[in-house]
């Protein structure tokens, strides 16, 4: 992480303290997504999907980042079966259909994308379901996948959602062309 770019530094630059945060959502537990957990410990709730937690704790040895969160793990939630996403499972964060944590297995078994709705528009935060918009245009799944078939299914869903005229923005965690921005919709 470049100087000034850690989550703690970015929040401080905006005058936001960890205790001001109601939620911190961990899409998955890869080191690059969980390394800043100590900088947001004051948040009211830190959340990760139970399925992601299970696979990272008990099965997948690639998760060398466990030491960052095992002493005080994030709170876990269960996906619910519904009609949303490639796996037809999501977690309705507020119970009002405004924010769904959509199960997009493939890169990891329990990863989610955040689907944020406002009226008839939405923003999709894809985590590592796609590297950039080029990924869904070319059909290129992430380089590291637990399950390439499920990753392709997730990528196809991301592409479909991203091309929808109701999509205000579709953002990927590792897109080199992404820039800090405010999205109003």
For each feature predicted by the language model, list its residue ranges.
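Metallo-beta-lactamase
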Residues: 1-32, 50-103, 148-167
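Catalytic core of the metallo-beta-lactamase
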Residues: 19, 35, 39-42, 77-133
């Amino acid at each position: 992480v470049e100087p000034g770019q850690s989550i703690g530094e970015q929040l401080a630059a905006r005058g936001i303290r960890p205790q001001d945060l109601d939620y911190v959502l961990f899409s998955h537990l890869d080191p690059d997504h969980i390394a800043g957990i100590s900088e947001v410990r004051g948040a009211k709730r830190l959340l990760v999907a139970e399925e992601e937690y299970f696979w990272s704790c008990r099965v997948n040895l690639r998760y060398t980042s466990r030491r960052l969160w095992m002493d005080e793990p994030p709170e876990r939630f269960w996906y619910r079966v519904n009609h949303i996403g490639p796996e037809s499972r999501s977690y309705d964060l507020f119970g009002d259909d405004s924010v769904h944590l959509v199960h997009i297995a493939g890169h990891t078994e329990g990863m989610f994308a955040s689907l944020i709705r406002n009226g008839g528009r939405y923003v999709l935060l894809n985590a590592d379901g796609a590297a950039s918009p080029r990924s869904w245009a070319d059909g290129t799944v992430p380089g590291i996948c637990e399950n390439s078939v499920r990753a392709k299914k997730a990528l196809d869903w991301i592409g479909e959602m991203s091309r929808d005229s109701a999509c205000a923005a579709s953002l990927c965690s590792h897109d080199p062309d992404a820039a800090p921005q405010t999205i109003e919709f």
